[in-house]
Every structure is written in structure tokens, then in C-alpha cells.
Amino acid sequence: MNEEMEQIIFQIILHGGNGRSSAMEAIAAAKSGDAEEARKKLQDAAEELSKAHHYQTELIQNEAGGEKTEMTLLMVHAQDHLMNAMTVKDMAAEIIELYEKITEQRGASI
């Protein structure tokens, strides 16, 4: 694996991890009643995942252009990390919405 490929893979892992962390922080903020912070953290997660997705797309475009991608354990880990982070972000959005509805039904605002 060449150095450029390693850098792309590490960027996917980095931004995927940052996105997942922000999504988890969004859930924690919603749980504590801070809707504004929850939405901000969810937006942060989306931005980080967008960066990771950019690098993933670069790999796909390179392969579509004839450049073969060497599948390594590190590459599989990066892809798994990104997909997991995307799922966590999607679930965080749903959980935040549930916290908001529950709080609204109780007569307060989250």
C-alpha cells in the first residue's frame, strides 16, 4: 500500500471517528435537556461524516478510473468505521427526536 492510500484511509478513520463521537455527544446533550447543543453536535457529526465520505468517494472514483484498490485489513477497518459512524449519526437523530417528543409531552422543552 502506498503512502497516499494510507493517508486517505486514515482520513476516513479520523473523520468517521470524529463523526461518531459528535453523534454520541448529541445524544448526551439531548438526554440532559440541551436541544440546541444536541442539534449542533448532530450537525458537527454530519460535517465530519461528509469529509470522510469525500475520501471514500475519492477511492471509488480512482478505482472507476482503472486504479485498482488494494484491499487490506486497514481498508476494511476504515470502511467499517465509516459505515458504523453513519449508522450512529442516523440513530442519534432519531433518539434526539424521541427525547424532544417525550419532553414536549411532559410539558417542557428539551
Curated annotation (Swiss-Prot):
Protein name: Lichenan-specific phosphotransferase enzyme IIA component
Positions of the PTS EIIA type-3 domain: 3-101
Cited SUPFAM superfamilies: Enzyme IIa from lactose specific PTS, IIa-lac
Family annotation (InterPro entries): PTS_IIA_lac/cel, PTS_IIA_lac/cel_sf
Broad class of the protein's primary localization: cytoplasm
Keyword terms, alphabetized: Cytoplasm, Phosphotransferase system, Sugar transport, Transferase, Transport
Example of a GO biological process term: phosphoenolpyruvate-dependent sugar phosphotransferase system
Active site as annotated: H77
Compartment(s): Cytoplasm
UniProt xrefs under CDD domains: PTS_IIA_lac
GO cellular component: cytoplasm
PANTHER family (UniProt xref): PTS SYSTEM N,N'-DIACETYLCHITOBIOSE-SPECIFIC EIIA COMPONENT
Spans traversing the lipid bilayer: none
GO molecular function, one term: protein-phosphocysteine-sugar phosphotransferase activity
The organism's taxonomic lineage, starting at the top: Bacteria, Bacillati, Bacillota, Bacilli, Bacillales
Domain observations: The EIIA domain is phosphorylated by phospho-HPr on a histidyl residue. Then, it transfers the phosphoryl group to the EIIB domain.
Function recorded in the entry: The phosphoenolpyruvate-dependent sugar phosphotransferase system (PTS), a major carbohydrate active -transport system, catalyzes the phosphorylation of incoming sugar substrates concomitant with their translocation across the cell membrane. This system is involved in lichenan transport.
Pfam families cross-referenced by the UniProt entry: PTS_IIA
Induction text: Induced by lichenan, lichenan hydrolysate and cellobiose. Subject to carbon catabolite repression.
